[in-house]
């Protein structure tokens, strides 16, 4: 039997995977194209959003600079090292903001308003639609600012950017982004059972700031939470330590991809469970 006449179950898995990957890549391009058209129609709003986003990033950096004017070191970290850590933390934060803004308002926009029914009617992954129906391109400035802070800190510390170190930067950046996405996806799934317009995202969102500083400034209990419960600290601190070549005890950098994989698996499992048990609001 030819491939064209074969049943879907008879198609080799690599071929089926390639077809699905190509299909979703095309859908992603379509989503982004549609988003770009909308933004071109509202350029003023986009510029205001970009300025507002950039101002928030600069405000956070200004706080760090003021802090180090008062104290030249923070738990043994100087300003260039802290800016490197701060800059790295902005990368997964920016990636999350670009791709997953819908998660923050999922309970209100999709569950309470009933838009999730429309999502489920389409023969496309519901999670894919939620993640990529909208983008926040203005959040790219956060990634750019983070890379600049890392470059400046590395330059002042005379850090040599070898191919291995660049590969580690990309690898840890992806892992950290997955951790951020997974944490908020886990929180988002609570909306399937507890209908609330605001949800539980805001207090956890504020915890992100704790991962932008050396974990050694916190108590052991707080460090545990930031590494294993809400691992924003693990996602930012230990990759920065590895990239800077600093020695810390314990060394948890090897656990970053493990935690990313575990949290992603939990998040996807909860999402699938939630969609299977979803009851329409009837809106």
Question: In which residue ranges do the predicted regions lie?
Answer:
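Hydrophobic transmembrane alpha-helices and immediately adjacent juxtamembrane helices
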Residues: 2-283
């Amino acid at each position: 039997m030819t491939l064209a006449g074969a049943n879907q179950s008879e198609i080799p898995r690599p071929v089926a995977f390639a077809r699905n990957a190509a299909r979703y890549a095309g859908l992603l391009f379509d989503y982004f194209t549609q988003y770009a058209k909308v933004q071109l129609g509202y350029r003023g709003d986009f510029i205001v959003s970009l300025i507002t986003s950039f101002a928030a990033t600069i405000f956070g950096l200004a706080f760090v600079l003021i802090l180090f004017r008062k104290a030249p070191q923070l738990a043994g970290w100087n300003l260039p090292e802290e800016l490197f850590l701060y800059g790295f933390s902005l990368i997964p934060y920016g990636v999350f903001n670009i791709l997953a803004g819908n998660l923050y308002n999922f309970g209100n926009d999709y569950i309470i308003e009933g838009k999730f029914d429309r999502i489920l009617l389409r023969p496309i992954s519901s999670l894919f639609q939620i993640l990529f129906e909208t983008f926040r391109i203005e959040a790219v400035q956060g990634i750019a600012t983070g890379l600049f802070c890392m470059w400046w800190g590395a330059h002042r510390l005379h850090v040599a950017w070898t191919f291995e170190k660049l590969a580690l930067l990309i690898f840890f950046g992806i892992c950290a982004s997955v951790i951020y996405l997974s944490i908020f996806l886990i929180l988002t799934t609570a909306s399937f059972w507890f209908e609330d317009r605001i949800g539980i995202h805001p207090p956890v969102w504020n915890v992100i700031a704790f991962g932008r500083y050396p974990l050694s400034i916190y108590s052991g209990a707080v460090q545990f939470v930031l590494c294993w419960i809400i691992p924003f600290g693990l996602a930012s601190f230990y990759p920065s330590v590895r990239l800077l070549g600093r020695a810390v005890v314990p060394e948890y950098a090897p656990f970053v991809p493990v935690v990313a994989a575990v949290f992603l698996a939990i998040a996807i499992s909860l999402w699938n469970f939630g969609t299977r048990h979803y009851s329409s609001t009837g809106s």
